[in-house]
Amino acid sequence: MNTKRKICVVTGTRAEYGLLQPIMKAIKEDKLLELQVAVTGMHLSPEFGLTYKTIEEDDFEISEKIEILLSSDTSIGVAKAIGLATISFSETLNRLKPDFIMILGDRFELLAAAQAALVSRIPIVHLAGGDVTEGAFDEAIRHSITKMSQLHFVTNKESEKRVHQLGEDPESIHLVGNPGLDHLNSLKLMGKNELEKSLRYSFKSKNILVTFHSVTLDNAPSVNSFSALLEALDGLGEDIGIIFTRPNADTEGRQLIKMLDKYVEDRSNCIVYTSLGQLRYLSTVALVDVVVGNSSSGILEAPSLKTATVNIGDRQKGRLRADSIIDCEPITENIKESIQQAFKLDCSTVVNPYGDGNTTERVLKVLREINHPERLIKKHFYDIDFEYS
């Protein structure tokens, strides 16, 4: 009789999988736990690189593939995808019958998974709750998932306070750090020659890694901000090497991809990838001079690799910042000046505020020691005493 505790890990994007991978590996190898993997979202889209194959190449068995993406990336298309995902996840959870479902972050497909788990009475383990990203509707999704979750693994002290403010019992909140940093303690990054061969790209004297996603709560279209970024990159000159990774499948995402592909076509110093994969991505971050854009990786991982970040606009507004991060407005001249400033930044002594790279063991310790997961379902609102004037 199988008495292992079943943990169903949900992943919908390449970036999120990179953060979850150390925990997934540890669950798979643990004698008391059984790993289930539910793959959805961009992982299953040819347009975004069919990155579920990376999960299989990492020797994980995929328990269920849940296709939800529509051809439209308008707000209506995304809303319909959430509905389809909720239906699909309810069927998946009924088949897999996990003891816990594990979710990281704030993507719209994760909201659907959480809703399905909530009504199916399956306890939710939420990683990175309480973080703040004021420029995207992901902010509201993250806090919504917190209220549906029974266990909270937070990345920093400020996030711990926010989850408590949302009425969650302090005993259910565990400060563990950012799981993406665990790799940096064990992963052997690629050297310059090996990476150049793998990327089919020759590094210049100065190099930039660019990832720019749509900003879903911005009043101005994301294409305007992206256009300002591309103009700023042109102003740096052709002797700067630029490596792009494509945007996510968010509202306006496909418009940004079209702009990016057209831009790269005409410029010999630029190259674009749908997905670099975790090893190549982190190796690239470590070898370039600056990470540019509005991806969370510039905030969360780049400081540990001692690489400067130029963070554009409000997508990551509210997150803790290391000293290696320069914030700027999505205006061409501001972006250009910030990149030039970042080239001169010494990041050798930068400290990452998101942990020490030992998140996985902290998470597994809690999962092993929880008695009777089904008893976690019924929560009470944990009030905080406030003084009102």
Protein language model annotation of sequence segments:
Residues K6, V10-T11, G18-K28, I68-P170:
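Active-site and donor-binding regions of nucleotide-sugar-utilizing enzymes
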Residues D30-Q36, E61, G237-G241:
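A generic structural motif
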Residues L44-P46, S149-N224:
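A nucleotide-sugar donor-handling region in carbohydrate enzymes
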Residues I55, M190-L287:
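Donor-nucleotide binding loops and adjacent catalytic segments primarily
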Residues P303-T349:
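Nucleotide-sugar donor-binding patch of glycosyltransferase catalytic domains
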Residues F343-S389:
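C-terminal amphipathic helix plus adjacent low-complexity
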